[in-house]
């Protein structure tokens, strides 16, 4: 069959048109790339920091911390870590409990580089077992002595600076402790007097406390007993067999602890009902004094509970579940959340400074965060999923916030306000900067100006405080005028009337 004479030319025209379109498309793409050279960098953007405003809404923020490196066993030349569960920082040394490999890995930071210092798998001294089995935590004292939770060996070993055994802390031989129960120490801290506080698995009476001699001295910081009223009433009428099958009302357990510079114990728990977070009954972060009383200040707009929004995102939902805490020398503290892989920073009043981090496999993201520490201002996160330590360094923005808080605590309110002003130039949505300036003005006696800043961010408590002081100040400043006006309006007319009355009486006589 012969083709029509116009078919070939039409086909050729279409082909030429398509070629021109392809060339134009390529040129257009090239022009876009040239016009926006930063576009490819967006894929590597690590800005994932945020905070919450007065309304409880998520507000993006400049990064206060940025991830700059990760430390792995492979990079150190000793093979990968295996399920590491705890670590500790003292000066420029990092002590890692490489739990699955039954060893302690010591890492040294020198000239900004992290290098292997030594690997400890055994120690000397009079004991039947001088190796570790599943070590889960380590604490290093100021004297360079070590307390290691040798978990599977059911003991805490106290070693001197030469890795020689000093003593063992074992299950207390006390009537308050079930002598048939297992003793699996998981976390430990030691104060300057040698008092050791140990978190033991399935011990729900609080932390186990030992004297510096190794003698058991009791429990500290027992969690409040939580129970359901309906279950309680049901138990009153249930049979013995039914009661045995029901859940026993016991205090919930802690999951980690840390000492601050003043040797108060910060601790975390993730055993609570989510509704208890909303009315601030859960208290997932606590600060215990020597008596075990919670003294954590919670003056923020929202309690320190992590995320305020728990909706499903990327298959993750539910409240934040903190698994570790670390306290800085300026009384700010940080917690790591396993639910979404986030770090939350709070000031000494319980205000959220910022939150950052997420789940993932990139630098600065986490798989299964296990522990949190700090080295100077740097934050370090141990991840048992990624078998690595991620190091976060403070940014210039984060340093401004730290400086503002520190100067306020030192009583340098003018300087503190100046730092907060600089913060606002980088983040105009930062509520805490306005409140910080207001608090500085309040301390300086500039109550009227302080009221303006508190009003901007709906800080009713501080506004009320500033208003009362401003009213008192105003009255004190105007007291002369007030007395004068009172005398002129009330006293003077009465006095004039009295004088006239006397005068009339005298004239009548």
Language-model features, listed with the residues they occupy:
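Positively charged, low-complexity intrinsically disordered regions
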Residues: 5-8, 21, 116, 205
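Eukaryotic scaffold repeat domains enriched in small/polar residues
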Residues: 42-447, 457-458, 464-509
């Amino acid at each position: 069959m012969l083709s029509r004479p116009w078919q070939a030319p039409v086909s050729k025209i279409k082909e030429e048109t398509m070629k021109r379109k392809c060339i134009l498309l390529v040129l257009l793409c090239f022009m876009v790339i040239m016009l926006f050279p930063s576009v490819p960098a967006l894929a590597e953007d690590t800005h994932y920091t945020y905070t919450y405003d007065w309304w409880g809404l998520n507000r993006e923020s400049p990064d206060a911390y940025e991830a700059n490196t990760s430390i792995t066993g492979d990079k150190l030349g000793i093979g990968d870590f295996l399920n590491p569960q705890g670590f500790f920082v003292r000066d420029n040394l990092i002590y890692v409990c490489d739990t699955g490999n039954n060893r302690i890995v010591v890492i040294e930071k020198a000239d900004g580089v992290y290098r292997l210092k030594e690997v400890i798998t055994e120690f000397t001294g009079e004991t039947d077992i001088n190796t570790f089995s599943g070590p889960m935590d380590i604490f290093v004292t100021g004297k360079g002595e070590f307390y290691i939770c040798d978990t599977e060996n059911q003991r805490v070993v106290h070693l001197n600076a030469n890795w020689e055994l000093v003593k063992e802390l074992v299950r207390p031989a006390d009537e308050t402790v079930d002598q048939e129960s297992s003793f699996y120490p998981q976390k430990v801290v030691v104060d300057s007097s040698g008092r050791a506080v140990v978190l033991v698995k399935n011990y729900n009476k609080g932390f186990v406390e030992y004297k510096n001699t190794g003698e058991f001295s009791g429990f500290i910081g027992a969690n409040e007993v939580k129970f359901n009223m309906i279950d309680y009433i049901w138990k009153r009428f249930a049979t013995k067999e039914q009661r045995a099958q029901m859940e026993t009302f016991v205090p919930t357990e802690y999951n980690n602890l840390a000492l601050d510079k003043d040797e108060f114990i910060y601790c975390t728990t993730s055993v609570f009902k989510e509704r208890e977070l909303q009315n601030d009954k859960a208290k997932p972060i606590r600060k215990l004094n020597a008596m075990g009383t919670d003294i954590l200040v919670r003056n923020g707009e929202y309690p320190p509970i992590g995320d305020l929004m728990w909706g499903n995102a990327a298959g993750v939902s539910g409240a934040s579940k903190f698994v570790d805490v670390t306290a800085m020398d300026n009384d700010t503290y940080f917690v790591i959340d396993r639910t979404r892989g986030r770090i939350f920073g709070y000031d000494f009043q319980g205000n959220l400074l910022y939150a950052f981090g997420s789940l993932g496999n990139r630098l600065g993201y986490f798989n299964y965060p296990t522990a949190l520490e700090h080295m100077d201002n740097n934050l370090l996160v141990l991840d048992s999923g990624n078998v690595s330590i991620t190091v976060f360094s403070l940014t210039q923005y984060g340093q401004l916030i730290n400086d503002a808080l520190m100067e306020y605590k030192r009583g340098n309110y003018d300087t503190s306000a100046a730092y907060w002003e600089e913060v606002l130039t980088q983040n105009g949505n930062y509520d805490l900067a306005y409140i910080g300036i207001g608090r500085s003005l309040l301390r300086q006696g500039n109550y009227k100006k302080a009221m303006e800043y508190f009003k901007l961010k709906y800080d009713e408590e501080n506004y009320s405080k500033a208003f009362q002081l401003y009213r008192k100040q105003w009255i004190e400043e105007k007291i002369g005028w007030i007395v004068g006006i009172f005398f002129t309006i009330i006293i003077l007319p009465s006095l004039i009337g009295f004088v006239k009355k006397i005068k009339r009486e005298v004239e009548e006589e």
